[in-house]
Structure formats: structure tokens, C-alpha cells
């Protein structure tokens, strides 16, 4: 297993409680307050935002914004009115790129209006997508054809570069059919370790079950945040072999790679959400120089809800001077 590059994540959460945890393979984690946009857009309860800083993000991508959308299950609870609201969200945010995490529809006829809405204002640096388990069970050819028609790049089992100036970042896509994990190794395995790589996977379990070497950040969905939970903290049904571990938000696989799991927008089986708000995820990338001094760590971890002060957690290996950032092999 390759060693991970040090990655600094400055995270603005929208959950009731933000808990910072020291995690293997990550040099610094800062939880920097919270922002919640609640009820502004019909059918989308919140926009969860993350600021992601890494030495492997090129300077030209500093401030680059990615909108991640998954599990629309259109129409389910996500009706015509809320579809229009999604279009408004995309328009107002005006991201540089859009990434789609699968489970788009509850019927083939709903795919085109969904993609048409998302791509009404095409992002400058493109849209990138994978399939979810629902999309593999039905409408697969229709979905892939419509991706092509709306200039959405289908990235399963491949990796593509997003070019900006003379630099680039890479987005890769995993195939999630559960039974195909061993047959479909991660498309990140042969990527150059110095690149900043985002891996799209429908289920977060893939990031734990597979070797995803050379991946800097995983974006996943599928769990719906439990869809029905006890006060947002405990879900009887998680749609994950790992229980609550990858239910929502930022977590880490055993290798220490960050996995962001969105609660998504729509529903499946039963049209109800309870303490599992629908959301889209907005990432802002920041180029971080290896020579920059890091924030002084707070030894005490504050777990109070609605954090207003940054919390810095630095593993012991990073207290050395000068700061040596481990690199991927």
C-alpha cells in the first residue's frame, strides 16, 4: 500500500455535531465552523461545503469549485418542483465542475429531464459521472446515451484529466456492482502518485474493500445518510456493510484516505426522510505549499455542536521542524 500524501482538509460542516478525529495518513485536519443553508431551495435542505487543501492541488486550481450531486432517485420525493430547485442551486453556485454519483432515476423517462436541468448551465470544466446500483439494474444504456448527449463524461473504470492552464487534476470512476469489486480494480492504481486524484464511487464501501492507491479524496453516496435515523446519529438501515462508519459526511478508510459520503437528494423504497436531510456537496480546492507553516494545534478536542473556532489536530510526526510532508510512493 502506498503512503498517502499529506492533505489538509478545512471543512465547513452542516451537521448538528462536528467531531474532529485524529486519522492515520493525514497530517492535519481542521474543522472550521459550520454553514447551513436550510430550506432556501425546495427539496434540498442543505448545501454541505468542504474546503480541501493539498500540496498536490496545482496553484491554477486554487479556488476551483466542484458540485457533487448523488442519489436524486428522480422523482421519488424529488418532484418536478424540486427538480427546478436543483436547477436553481446549480445556477446560483455556478461551479467550475460537476460530479455525479449515480442512482439518478426511478424510471427511464426521468433521466433526460434530470440531466437537462443539471446541465442547463454547463460548467466550464465539465461534468463527470458514474452509475449507481439502480442505474445498473435498469436504464443503463439510456443513461449512458443521455450522458453523451448532454456532454457528461462517463468515467467508470477510467481516469480523465481536468485541465486548467498548464496544470491538471484527475477524476476517476469506480464500477459499483458489489459482485464486480474483484473484477474491477480501482482505475487509480496506475496513476502518477504526484497527481491530485478524486475517485467517484457510488458506495463508500468500495473505498474500504478495494485498494484505491493514489487516491487523494473519495466522493460517494448510496447511504442516503440512513434516510430514516434517530436524531441524525443512528440509522437502522445503512446500505453499507460497515454499519454507521461511512453513513454520511467525512470519514476515513483503513488506509487513511478521506471519504466524503453525501446523504443525497431523493429516496428509495419509502418516500420519507427523517433526520437525514437531503443535500448537495460543494467542494472548494486550495493549493497548499509544503513550505507553509501549519496552524498551531489545539491539544484539546472540542466536540461542542456548532463549532465557531477552528480545531487543529496534528499527529506527533508533524511536530518536527522543519515540517516533512510524507509523499505517496
Spans of model-derived segments:
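Acidic, histidine-bearing metal-coordination/catalytic regions of metal-dependent phosphoesterases
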Residues: 2-65, 76, 312-329
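Beta-strand-turn-beta hairpins that frame and shape the catalytic cleft
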Residues: 45, 54-67, 152, 160-173, ...
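Acidic, His/Gly-rich catalytic cores of divalent-metal-dependent hydrolytic chemistry
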Residues: 25-48, 255-326
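Membrane-embedded segments
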Residues: 60-145, 150-153
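Binuclear metal-dependent hydrolase catalytic cores centered on His/Asp/Glu-rich metal-binding motifs
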Residues: 87, 144-145, 149-152, 158, ...
Amino acid at each position: 500500500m502506498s503512503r498517502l500524501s499529506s492533505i489538509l482538509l478545512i471543512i465547513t460542516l452542516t451537521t448538528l455535531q462536528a467531531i474532529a478525529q485524529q486519522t492515520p495518513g493525514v497530517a492535519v485536519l481542521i474543522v472550521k465552523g459550520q454553514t447551513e443553508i436550510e430550506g432556501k431551495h425546495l427539496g434540498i435542505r442543505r448545501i454541505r461545503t468542504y474546503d480541501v487543501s493539498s500540496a498536490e492541488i496545482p496553484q491554477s486550481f486554487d479556488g476551483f469549485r466542484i458540485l457533487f450531486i448523488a442519489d436524486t432517485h428522480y422523482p421519488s420525493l424529488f418532484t418536478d418542483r424540486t427538480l427546478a430547485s436543483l436547477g436553481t442551486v446549480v445556477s446560483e453556485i455556478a461551479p467550475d465542475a460537476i460530479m455525479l454519483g449515480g442512482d439518478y432515476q426511478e424510471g427511464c423517462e426521468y433521466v433526460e429531464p434530470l440531466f437537462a436541468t443539471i446541465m442547463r448551465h454547463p460548467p466550464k470544466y465539465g461534468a463527470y459521472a458514474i452509475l449507481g446500483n439502480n442505474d445498473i439494474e435498469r436504464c443503463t444504456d439510456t443513461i449512458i446515451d443521455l450522458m453523451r448527449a448532454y456532454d457528461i463524461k462517463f468515467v467508470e473504470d477510467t481516469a480523465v484529466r481536468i485541465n486548467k492552464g498548464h496544470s491538471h487534476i484527475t477524476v476517476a470512476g469506480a464500477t459499483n456492482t458489489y459482485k464486480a469489486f474483484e473484477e474491477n480494480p480501482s482505475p487509480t492504481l496506475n496513476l502518477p502518485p504526484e497527481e491530485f486524484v478524486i475517485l467517484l464511487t457510488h458506495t463508500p464501501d468500495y473505498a474500504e474493500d478495494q485498494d484505491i492507491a493514489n487516491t487523494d479524496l473519495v466522493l460517494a453516496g448510496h447511504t442516503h445518510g440512513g434516510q430514516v435515523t434517530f436524531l441524525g446519529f443512528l440509522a437502522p438501515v445503512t446500505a453499507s456493510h460497515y454499519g454507521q462508519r461511512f453513513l454520511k459526511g467525512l470519514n476515513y478508510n483503513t488506509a487513511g484516505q478521506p471519504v466524503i459520503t453525501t446523504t443525497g437528494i431523493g429516496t428509495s423504497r419509502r418516500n420519507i426522510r427523517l433526520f437525514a436531510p437531503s443535500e448537495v456537496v460543494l467542494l472548494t480546492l486550495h493549493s497548499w505549499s509544503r513550505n507553509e507553516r501549519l496552524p498551531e494545534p489545539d491539544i484539546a478536542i472540542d466536540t461542542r455542536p456548532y463549532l465557531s473556532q477552528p480545531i487543529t489536530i496534528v499527529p506527533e510526526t508533524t511536530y518536527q521542524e522543519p515540517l516533512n510532508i510524507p509523499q505517496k510512493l
